[in-house]
């Protein structure tokens, strides 16, 4: 690229000429890493965080939102459920956009959807908006944000594969993926504070629209290329080499990927249930909403910290399967402990510790699992392999939520601090949740085996020394 200087690494030729199908790729072929990859990663992190905040804007203040929007509580819940619906409905189109039209188109398009949705939500609560139209306008804005979510959620593996060298891919994936979790944490903390301070939704929605607008501006003006001028690694040049529909068919014939799809997707579904039902499970045993929020926040913080450490480790060791299997086993143990401790009153310290372990081993393995999906399916599109797993998790989450709520029975516990007529006995549901988690972990540990196809392809085509510097972008 003109105007750019770069420190590059020579591509070491294979001993067999047949291994090099392109005769023009001679010893002059080189790999380059560009400093702008960190800018694109930062934009994706901000966009992912902003979209997660939009998703969970109303859930922590559902009661106040129902009053201020003049609607019922079930309608307020749909402001969050629309994200789950959009993730399932738009998953295949989002995968196609990422793997066919490219990363730049996906990030700019999703940033505009997210920003327009956030701004439309603000317009919905303005005083000039008729009362009968308030909820409809807010829901339209929320739907636009929801349509952006699959493009944002599926992007980290694509960005890591295209722009980052092999020793930084898991870390880049972790940073982009965990930004979504940080957004959920911020929404849990900020929504109650802002609404209690202002007494309305205008200030809340206005503040949440700022990071969305900034991400849109940065993506539109700052991202100029879908791929780097020179590949960052041997595998990035073959990313998404298969047509989309042909890639889907190949995925469905991959036994190891099916196991990962179902077992890892089950883990995503379990954690969605945990986050959604935590307050309802704890209130019946006398734990306040504030304490439930602390438990949720602790699990997220520990998960982010664990993801950072695990990503650094697998970037260097490449032990994706070992890390996944160990963490899934420890997650099932933590889930079983939560099923027992959550049914005991006056065990605050122990409950926080269990939630800490649950988040540490469960949340932290998400970026590693997404990288493992790419290793299992290379050279198929990264967005397709990771996107199908996320979609599987959303579908299983919906099924588990319906099952667990059906198993919960009304109760009249003397320790309950739940709202009137909402106390439920969650003993059987949490045991079922722990059982599902344990079964998924056992199946994954026993039956999942795969070769690291992307690493093998890179080893076959080149031996790349660790870059000594980044390209200086013009």
Curated annotation (Swiss-Prot):
It is a multi-pass membrane protein. The chain crosses the membrane at residues 38-58, 69-89, 105-126, 134-154, 175-195, 201-221, 258-278, 290-310, 326-346, 349-369, 388-408, 428-448. The keyword Transmembrane helix applies. The keyword Transport applies. Its main location: membrane. Gene3D superfamilies: MFS general substrate transporter like domains. Belongs to the major facilitator superfamily. One of its GO terms (molecular function) is transmembrane transporter activity. Keywords: Membrane, Transmembrane, Transmembrane helix, Transport. One of its GO terms (cellular component) is membrane. It comes from Danio rerio (Zebrafish). It is found in: Membrane. CDD domains: MFS_MFSD7. Residues 1-20 are annotated as: Disordered. This is Solute carrier family 49 member A3.
């Amino acid at each position: 690229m003109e105007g750019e200087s770069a420190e590059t690494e020579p591509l070491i030729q294979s001993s067999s000429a047949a291994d090099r199908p392109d005769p023009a790729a001679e010893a002059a072929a080189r790999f380059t890493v560009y400093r702008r990859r960190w800018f694109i990663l930062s934009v994706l992190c901000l966009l992912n965080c902003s979209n997660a905040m939009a998703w969970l804007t109303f859930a922590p203040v559902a009661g106040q939102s129902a009053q201020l929007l003049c609607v019922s509580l079930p309608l307020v819940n749909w402001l969050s459920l629309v994200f789950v619906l959009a993730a399932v409905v738009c998953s295949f189109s989002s995968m196609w956009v990422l793997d066919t039209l490219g990363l730049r188109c996906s990030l700019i398009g999703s940033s505009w959807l997210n920003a327009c949705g956030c701004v439309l939500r603000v317009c919905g609560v303005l005083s000039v908006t008729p009362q009968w139209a308030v909820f409809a306008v807010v829901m339209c804005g929320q739907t636009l944000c929801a349509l952006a979510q699959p493009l944002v959620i599926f992007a980290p593996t694509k960005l890591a594969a295209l722009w980052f060298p092999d020793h930084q891919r898991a870390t880049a994936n972790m940073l982009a993926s965990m930004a979504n979790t940080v957004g959920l944490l911020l929404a849990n903390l900020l929504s109650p504070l802002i609404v209690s301070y202002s007494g309305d939704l205008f200030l809340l929605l206005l503040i949440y629209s700022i990071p969305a607008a900034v991400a849109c501006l940065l993506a539109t003006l700052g991202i100029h290329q879908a791929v780097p001028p020179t590949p960052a690694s041997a595998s990035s040049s073959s990313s998404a080499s298969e047509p989309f529909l042909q890639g889907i068919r190949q995925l469905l014939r991959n036994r190891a990927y099916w196991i990962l799809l179902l077992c890892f997707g089950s883990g995503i579904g379990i954690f969605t249930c945990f986050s959604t039902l935590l307050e309802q499970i704890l209130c019946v045993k006398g734990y306040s909403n504030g304490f439930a929020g602390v438990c949720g926040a602790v699990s997220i913080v520990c998960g982010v910290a664990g993801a950072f450490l695990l990503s650094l480790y697998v970037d260097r060791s490449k032990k994706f399967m070992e890390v996944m299997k160990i963490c899934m086993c420890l997650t099932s143990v933590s889930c079983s402990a939560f099923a027992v401790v959550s049914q005991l009153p006056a065990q605050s310290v122990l409950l926080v510790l269990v939630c800490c372990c649950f988040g540490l081993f469960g949340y932290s393995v998400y970026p590693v699992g997404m990288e493992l999906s790419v290793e299992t399916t290379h050279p198929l599109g990264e967005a397709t392999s990771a996107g199908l797993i996320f979609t599987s998790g959303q579908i299983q989450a919906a099924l588990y939520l319906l099952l667990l709520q059906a198993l919960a029975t009304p109760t009249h516990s003397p320790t309950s601090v739940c709202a009137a007529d909402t106390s439920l006995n969650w003993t059987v549901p949490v045991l079922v949740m722990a059982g599902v988690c344990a079964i998924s972990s056992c199946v994954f540990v026993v039956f999942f085996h795969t070769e690291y196809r992307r690493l093998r392809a890179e080893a076959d085509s080149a031996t790349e020394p660790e870059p000594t510097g980044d390209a200086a972008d013009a």
